[in-house]
Amino acid sequence: MEFLRRRIETQVLSLTGLALGGIDYENPPGDPGLFGPASVCWRVHGDFTSMLVGGISALLLQALHPLALAGVWDHSNFRADLLGRLRRTGQFISATTFGSRADAERLIERVRAIHLQVTGHAPDGRPYAASDPDLLTWVHVAEVSSFLKSHLRYLGPTLPDHAQDRYYAEVALIAERLGARDVPRSRAQVDDYLERIRPQLRCDERSREILRILRAAPAPSALAKPFGMLMLHAGVELLPDWASELFGLPLTAQRRQLIRTGVRCTAPLLRWAVRNGSVHRAHRRMGLPPR
């Protein structure tokens, strides 16, 4: 049984930012980082399964914004190294949530510097810049709204409304530090923002290519392949209805229930197996009992 547990954990951690190294989540002792263990974002960001589903859904949602997608398309090797991009994104989220304050601030400054180099023109001729405050807000909202929605669906459905609002207020700090402006800080503000930005979104050939790349992404092992496909289906199923319609991905109620049941049956096994994720290491840094 211990062999199985370690095997599963190794497979899981190979998909995360921990595989990149460079962040010591267990030091310095007692450093709460930017948020600390009493924060809501420690609860929401601490579960691998719900974060993976939310991350896939966020990636698809972000791909509906032509300018945001153009920056990734022109300045990233995601088509050849999707796993690498997911790891780097995961590292940033984990380090800014669970890392020491010094590591979190270092990564924020690194990403800000990278964003300054990402400029160009979308296929329709419009200029874009990754440092554009409005684009940064879009990427942030697409991401954190997907994380929270996945958490509510697959881990913490009873998270109180006030805690959900607090989550948005907490993570707004990261977006603002990156240069975003007018960042929504509550459920009502997020809902209003998504409604206002919808006229700017569309599904084009590049958007559909993102979906094709996700579907064709190689699994790190034969053991992980069925799990990866389930997570992809769950990420698609998590999309807002209007986003699913843009992608042309209607799902029947029966199909939705099948996907959700699959995730809920799989998640407990992963939670049992993983004992050394970033959240576990951060708990050790803070001298807290194991999760």
Which residues are covered by each model-predicted region?
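Mature, function-bearing regions of proteins
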Residues: 1-138, 142-291
